[in-house]
Amino acid sequence: MALRYPMAVGLNKGHKVTKNVSKPRHSRRRRRLTKHTKFVRDMIREVCGFAPYERRAMELLKVSKDKRALKFIKKRVGTHIRAKRKREELSSVLAAMRKAAAKKD
């Protein structure tokens, strides 16, 4: 603890010391996407395409049935948070497809 104020009592009492800065734990980097993992996932997506439930969810998103799509995906993937993440992923894919189609024209 650093002696911020010259007082003998309280939180700031004691000797002046420098804080020992520790590296963040390795467990903190969990779920961070690496370049290799991203490359592999993109490759698999390109080869395999989308699952049938993902295609149906994309159709629901196309006709702006976002809530229905969320409920449908939640039923398939299990949890609300995973469903929201999947819906965001699919809507970003649709936006990219729209952008590519507009660029082509």
Curated annotation (Swiss-Prot):
Q: Which family does it belong to?
A: Belongs to the eukaryotic ribosomal protein eL36 family.
| UniProt entry keywords in alphabetical sequence | Acetylation, Cytoplasm, Ribonucleoprotein, Ribosomal protein
Which biological processes are named by the entry's GO terms? Answer: translation
**Where does this polypeptide localize?**
Cytoplasm, Cytosol; Cytoplasm
Q: Name one GO molecular function term.
A: structural constituent of ribosome
- Source organism: Oryctolagus cuniculus
- Tell me the name of the encoding gene: RPL36
- Superkingdom classification of source: Eukaryota
Which purpose does this protein serve, as stated in its record? Component of the large ribosomal subunit. The ribosome is a large ribonucleoprotein complex responsible for the synthesis of proteins in the cell.
Q: Where is this region: Disordered?
A: 9-31
Q: What is this protein called?
A: Large ribosomal subunit protein eL36
Q: Which residue windows does the record flag with biased composition (Basic residues)?
A: 13-31
Chief location bin: cytoplasm
Q: An example Gene Ontology cellular component term from the record?
A: cytosol
Under the heading InterPro entries, the entry gives: Ribosomal_eL36 (IPR000509), Ribosomal_eL36_sf (IPR038097)
A Pfam family it matches: Ribosomal_L36e
Assembly and oligomerization: Component of the large ribosomal subunit.
Q: Which residues carry this modification: N6-acetyllysine?
A: K62
